[in-house]
């Protein structure tokens, strides 16, 4: 099957959603599908000094990446959506459009393309334009399925009467299979100390406040190793701890 994956993730970047998108495209390709990933051409937001996008994300180069125009201005998302529309209009050699970008998935149905929409969160604002687009999307005969990452999220959409049960597929987030459990990474600090790891973003609400508050209460033979975060957040916590 030929799949066009529509994303609004900045690639390359440090965001979790960009990692998810790249891993999903690799997984589709690993299962024998021909995949093209559409992503915004937002050079001002790219992670700097990345020579190879695929290598940066630790994925195989078994799918293509196509960057589409997305100006860094108010309303840029509308222009990006139009860029997706015209790309799909010109490039018709695919069987399915899949993605997490609601606007892009919706315009794909306007061109009579079969679509699968993936979402990781409920639609909270019932009066927003996203709500209108979503309702139009799910009424389209070209809408085939919505993928959610938990049964709880599926229940929210069912309770609100958006879709029938058969139209929502639960597919929990996964991870690559670990091939070598004995592989060790050399970390800073003493080899004899207990090493506690944290991976993820460092902005408020992700857990760094808890780590910072308990750091000076731990025994000296306990080390905390933090991996992740944007440069501004790394700088903030380095100055604070």
Language model: regions and residue ranges:
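Acidic anion/phosphate-binding donor-loop and adjacent secondary structure
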Residues: 125-129, 158-159, 167-193, 204-207
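Short His-centered aromatic/hydrophobic patch
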Residues: 98-104, 119
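Glycosyltransferase donor-sugar binding loop
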Residues: 41, 199, 223-237
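Nucleotide-sugar donor phosphate/pyrophosphate-binding loop at the beta->alpha transition
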Residues: 75-83, 111-114, 119-142, 155, ...
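Conserved donor-binding/catalytic core segment of Leloir-type glycosyltransferases
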Residues: 4, 147, 188-215, 219, ...
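An amphipathic, basic-hydrophobic alpha-helix
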Residues: 51-97, 106-110, 130-137
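N-terminal strand-loop element at the rim of the active site
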Residues: 5-15, 27-79, 229-233
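A short, active-site helix/loop in glycosyltransferases that binds the activated sugar's phosphate group
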Residues: 107, 140-168, 172-180
């Amino acid at each position: 099957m030929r799949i066009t994956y529509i994303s609004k993730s900045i690639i390359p970047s440090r965001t979790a959603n960009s990692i998810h998108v790249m891993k999903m495209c690799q997984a589709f390709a690993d299962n024998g599908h021909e995949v093209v990933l559409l992503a915004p051409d937002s050079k001002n937001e790219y992670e700097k000094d990345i020579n190879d996008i695929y290598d940066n994300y630790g994925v195989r180069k078994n799918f293509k990446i196509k960057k589409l125009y997305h100006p860094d201005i108010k309303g840029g998302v509308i222009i990006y959506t139009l860029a997706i529309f015209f790309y799909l209009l010109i490039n018709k050699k695919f069987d399915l459009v899949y993605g997490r970008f609601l606007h892009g998935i919706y315009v794909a149905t306007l061109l009579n393309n079969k679509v699968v929409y993936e979402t990781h969160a409920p639609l909270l604002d019932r009066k927003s334009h996203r709500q209108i687009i979503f309702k139009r999307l799910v009424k389209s005969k070209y809408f085939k399925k919505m993928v959610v990452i938990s049964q709880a999220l599926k229940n929210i959409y069912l309770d609100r009467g958006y879709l029938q049960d058969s139209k929502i597929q639960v597919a929990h987030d996964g991870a690559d299979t670990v091939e070598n459990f004995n592989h060790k990474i050399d970390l800073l600090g003493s080899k004899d100390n207990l090493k506690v790891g944290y991976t993820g973003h460092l902005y408020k609400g992700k857990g760094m406040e808890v780590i910072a508050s308990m750091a000076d209460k731990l025994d000296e033979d306990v080390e905390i190793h933090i991996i992740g975060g944007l440069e501004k957040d790394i700088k903030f916590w380095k100055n604070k701890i």
